[in-house]
């Protein structure tokens, strides 16, 4: 998958570190976090892009050590998420020791980015979900963070309410005429999901710490409804945002 682009790789905790043949900045790490399906095509494409430009890349897998395979966000018995791990446990990753860490997260990986934003030099969150709000998260300084919203994404619409209540909200880029998953090469499908209403109440930190990919837990805190979500790759926008992030990395 990456053999032609890397000189070696390392595994640190739950992060696969990929080192290109010629490193342009040995102080900088591009750290990439996956969404509900685990590491896949979006993470591979982003990794290949930055490796080809000489950047060391780390791919986070925050599922495997918690025995999470894939999240369905469903209340149907055969697809209902019922994992014991909490989001905080899953998102508690050991950041590799680089002077500059640029995080790029997709969907739930974008949520990981919001929760951990203070740990990064730059933080780019593509169509992040909002799994719950606390006053601590609302008070956090997101001046290093950019959220990329897909214009036609109805799954992650709660993020807008979250951002409106932040004291120092992230910068916002809007991907025109795009849907959830527009960074996933070849993706074109619709999926039924449960959408939890996560921005009506501000939770205590203790309450937030109990949240996880478990329908019974989430419905005890949040009302929910049913939606059919469209996921659609947009090659033009995908390439444009890769290049925008690259340009900002080159100035660090």
Predicted regions and their residues:
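Serine-hydrolase catalytic machinery in alpha/beta-hydrolase-like enzymes
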Residues: 10-19, 29-95
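Proline/glycine-enriched tight loop/beta-turn segments at coil->beta junctions
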Residues: 21-29, 140-142
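Primarily recognizes the serine-hydrolase "nucleophile elbow" in alpha/beta-hydrolase
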Residues: 87-142
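Short, proline-enriched alpha-helix->beta-strand connector loops that line the catalytic pocket
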Residues: 139-145, 168-169
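Short beta-strand/loop motif that positions the catalytic acidic residue
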Residues: 147-149
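Conserved alpha/beta-hydrolase "acid-adjacent" motif
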Residues: 154-161
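C-terminal catalytic histidine-bearing segment of alpha/beta-hydrolase fold enzymes
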Residues: 170-252
